């Protein structure tokens, strides 16, 4: 009986991408806490930061004002998205030299399916090492790589030896690795879900696997089924070339109708900042802003505006006020 060979999946994640580009291009920023994102006197957030800034507790999506309080000596710079996009395309060109099965996740990370690549003695680990070396040669930037037999484990592996590191999780190691993995390290499980799982007595992959499909579905809905499969070492998601996030959004439902214009504007402003933070986390940019309002009778009104340049927190808030 013929069986499909185990897949070989590589996850490449650039190291502190936006900040690394700025430190590469501006030597005065090197070896210093550098923050790319909103300025400290704005309501913006940290898009990414250098490892020097991370060492003092600053992280992505943190309000820039808080980052400034933590480290007043930090250097704050606005993102240069056109530059990042150009470099990202250079990196993707490197990927395509090895395989056409490349799934970009954001400007600075991607999955590669190298199952059928015969070079490097059929070793995905040696291949990943060659890819990261070539990226360094062409861009003077470092990347970390995770290698495994599915996307979930490859993603987890790429974070283990950051920065400028590589880690492989073999099929023989996979089940034990997942059993021992703290639930907060599972990709896709954020602080709120982690807290809920802890309340259910789930702290590791092994404890997660003890719950049935029905139990996980009752607590987490459709996502619970994904958790079930991951906990049981089942992740058959294919690498999909050219698949990118097309939109991000947030919404708020009130317990009763509101008409206070100040409250409406404050709420829309908070929702925008939350959506903008998602963009920053995914290292994406947006050109169109949409506001959707649903009334008690379920009538829905939508207003959109497309900007002439990528949306920043200042442009977005101004557009929100205009649309309202």
Model segments located where?
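Gly/Gly-Pro- and Ser/Thr-rich, intrinsically disordered tail segments characteristic of DNA damage-repair
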Residues: 1-219, 223-225, 239
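DNA-contacting surface of Y-family translesion DNA polymerases
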Residues: 4, 11, 185, 193-321
């Amino acid at each position: 009986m013929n069986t499909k060979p185990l897949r070989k999946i590589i996850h490449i994640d650039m190291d502190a991408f936006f900040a690394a580009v700025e430190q590469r291009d501006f030597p005065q920023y090197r070896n210093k806490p550098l923050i790319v994102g909103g300025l400290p006197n704005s309501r913006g957030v940290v898009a990414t930061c250098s490892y020097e800034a991370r060492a003092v507790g600053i992280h992505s999506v943190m309000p820039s004002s808080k980052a400034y309080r933590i480290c007043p000596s930090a250097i704050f710079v606005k993102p240069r998205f056109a530059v990042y996009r150009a470099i990202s395309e250079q990196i993707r060109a490197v990927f395509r030299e090895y395989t056409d099965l490349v799934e970009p996740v954001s400007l600075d990370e991607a999955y590669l399916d190298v199952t059928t690549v015969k070079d490097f003695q059929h070793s995905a680990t040696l291949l990943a090492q060659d890819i990261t070396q070539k990226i360094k040669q062409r861009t003077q930037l470092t990347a970390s790589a995770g290698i495994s037999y599915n996307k979930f484990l490859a993603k987890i592996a790429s974070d283990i030896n950051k920065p400028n590191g590589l880690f492989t999780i073999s099929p023989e190691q996979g089940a034990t690795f997942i059993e021992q993995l703290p639930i907060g390290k599972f990709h896709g499980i954020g602080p709120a879900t982690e807290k809920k799982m802890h309340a259910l007595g789930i702290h590791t992959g092994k404890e997660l696997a003890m719950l049935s499909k029905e139990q996980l579905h009752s607590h987490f809905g459709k996502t619970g089924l994904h958790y079930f499969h991951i906990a049981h070492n089942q992740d058959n998601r294919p690498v999909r070339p050219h698949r990118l996030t097309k939109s991000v959004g947030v919404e708020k439902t009130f317990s009763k109708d509101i008409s206070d214009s100040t409250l409406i504007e404050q709420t829309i402003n908070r929702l925008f900042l939350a959506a903008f933070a998602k963009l920053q986390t995914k290292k994406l940019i947006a050109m169109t802003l949409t506001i959707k309002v649903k009334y008690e009778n379920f009538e829905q009104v939508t207003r959109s505006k497309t900007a002439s340049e990528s949306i920043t927190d200042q442009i977005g808030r101004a557009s929100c006020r205009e649309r309202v």
